[in-house]
Design a protein with these regions (language model features):
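Ubiquitin-like/PB1-type beta-grasp interaction modules and other compact soluble beta-rich domains
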Residues: 1-78
């Protein structure tokens, strides 16, 4: 299955800001998080605390990812 993966803020240090990703065997947000943590163990904590959106809707870990989705990884941020 192919998706568009968008990375923001500190996650851009580990992943390209935008990439097409082939993710066979991945069905849920939690599956994707685990896959990305295995790819970049040094980003594991940041991925764990990040929110995920699918087609601009915030998703839960149990939500399904479908072919052609745009998935964004949104790390926590702070500001003033």
């Amino acid at each position: 299955m192919k998706i568009q993966l968008l990375s923001f803020a500190a996650l851009k240090d580990f992943f390209p800001p935008k990439q097409e990703l082939t993710i066979d065997g991945i069905q849920t947000v939690l599956d994707l998080k685990k896959h990305l943590q295995n790819q970049k163990p040094e980003a594991s904590h940041l991925i764990k605390v990040s929110r995920i959106s699918i087609n601009q809707i915030i998703a839960n870990d149990s939500d399904s990812i479908t072919e052609g989705s745009t998935v964004a990884i949104l790390p926590p941020s702070s500001g003033g």
